[in-house]
């Protein structure tokens, strides 16, 4: 049984004056909405133990269409690793830690500097955001080390949320951290690039951004994801501009934002070289492999929960 912590901490103060009944209803709806996207609670409802079986999935949450829960017999599972990064990744990993405890072999999460460290069995590195830093790189190297240990029969939980791109930035060969930082500064603060456009560039320049699956071999990969856009929206944060050549897409973004010439020489040379081993994941790299993806947080969670609670309270809500 999961007990939720109240989100609105000053509830009593807010109910101490004015139209108390009206406030109570409004705050009740707001509390339901604010609590719904909590990554810890949602992961606890998705990842659970049923005897000696590890069950992952919860059809009650918004998941990819057709995604049914998957089950693993723990007696037949080897090592269990937990890795990832993002501003909500610690909460995701904390839920897994509380479910699996000492069944977790090891792990590494990169979280944002300023956060408190919440994990006990899983390593945590506090790294830079929105500009990656040395800690982003050192923590990402640790993640890569763990991913490369995984073998058939092992399970790798990948916890990803907003901010993971900078927090787990490990530059590709030939591009320094300083050069990668300059790319972020130019795109974000100079050109004002939107997220899909920025991702089209920066995901090429780091070893793992959107490419974690490349390094897990034949191990089972269970991705626990949050997204900032509702699933029905056409544009998703991880999508890239249409292009038959993804490297061309990155180059086109830089030219369209008039910042190609502002890019460090190493970045321009890397993109023009079009090395496929560092490009986006190819379908054949993961086809037929035991990879599962579960979405545990999105903005529609808040809206849908608030709507349900309003109707439960007898309001004519739409």
Predicted segment positions?
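Glycine-rich oxoanion-binding loops at beta->alpha junctions
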Residues: 57, 62-66, 110-152, 196, ...
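Short, acidic/small-residue loops that bind anionic groups at enzyme active sites
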Residues: 105-108, 173-201
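A glycine/threonine-rich phosphate-anchoring loop and its flanking beta-alpha core
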Residues: 193-260, 267-271
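A glycine- and small-aliphatic-rich helix-loop capping segment at beta-alpha/alpha-beta transitions
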Residues: 95-104, 121-123, 148, 171-182, ...
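Short beta-strand segments
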Residues: 83-85, 108-111, 157-162, 199, ...
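Accessory alpha-helical/coil subdomains and C-terminal extensions
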Residues: 222-223, 242-317
């Amino acid at each position: 049984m999961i007990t939720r912590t109240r989100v609105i901490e000053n509830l009593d103060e807010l109910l101490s004056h004015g139209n108390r009944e009206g406030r109570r209803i409004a705050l009740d709806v707001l509390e339901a909405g604010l609590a719904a996207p909590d990554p810890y609670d949602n992961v606890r409802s998705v990842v659970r133990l049923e005897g000696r079986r590890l069950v992952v999935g919860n059809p009650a949450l918004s998941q990819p269409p057709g995604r049914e829960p998957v089950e693993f017999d723990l007696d037949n599972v080897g090592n269990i690793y937990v890795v990832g990064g993002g501003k909500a990744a610690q909460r995701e990993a904390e839920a897994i830690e509380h479910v699996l405890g000492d069944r977790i072999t090891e792990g590494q999460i990169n979280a944002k500097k300023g956060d408190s460290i919440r994990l006990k069995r899983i390593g945590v590195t506090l790294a830079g955001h929105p500009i990656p830093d040395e800690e982003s790189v050192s923590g990402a190297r640790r993640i890569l080390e763990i991913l490369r240990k995984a073998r058939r029969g092992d399970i790798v939980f990948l916890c990803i949320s907003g901010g993971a791109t900078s927090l787990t930035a490990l530059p590709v060969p030939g591009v320094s951290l300083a050069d990668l930082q300059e790319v972020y500064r130019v795109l974000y603060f100079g050109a004002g690039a939107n997220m899909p456009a920025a991702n089209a560039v920066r995901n090429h320049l780091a070893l793992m951004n959107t490419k974690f699956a490349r390094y897990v071999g034949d191990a089972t990969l269970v991705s626990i994801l949050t997204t900032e856009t509702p699933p029905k929206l056409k544009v998703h944060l991880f999508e890239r501009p249409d292009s038959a050549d993804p490297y061309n897409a990155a180059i086109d973004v830089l030219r369209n934002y008039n910042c190609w010439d502002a890019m460090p020489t190493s970045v321009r040379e890397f993109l023009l070289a079009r090395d496929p081993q560092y490009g986006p994941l190819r379908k054949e790299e993961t086809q037929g492999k035991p990879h599962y993806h579960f979405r545990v947080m999105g903005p529609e969670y808040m809206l849908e929960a608030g709507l349900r609670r309003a109707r439960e309270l007898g309001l004519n809500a739409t």
